[in-house]
């Protein structure tokens, strides 16, 4: 039933609520944006990063811990909220990762990862993976290895185990497209953990 950051991994949010984008990548082909699809109009001024962060913060998201295996065989993981379903046929998911993340190198080498969806009472788990070193984040965390070897965390709402299909460059982040190989849900009505306007939130609040 129920199973399934380093400083470089987390976004600029309060330390007590450092659920954010993560760091990972994979062995699939690395794609870049089509230059013909970008604007060169000098009148188009870019929005300041702080303004963009403030505006996009009004879009509530779920919170996950993305896990994989390092080159030393040890588990790695990072908190991520830039996660979305991409396709049902085939089942694809995308995750946005900080390009400076240590988890990026692990997923790139391993070629697989798991997305663990957190419940409302798992704020501390989210914070641990958002701001601690990779090894310290795993202290006391119960988990088991899935078919790809990626860790599935005990007690989460759902876990999706994926193999890497593509890695797409996107500014200071990379977009990882994963093919979902196995899913597992808790079978409970536990509310999800949300991230909204720079802090954790509940369904009623958001």
Language model segments and positions:
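Basic, polyanion-binding surface patches
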Residues: 2-206
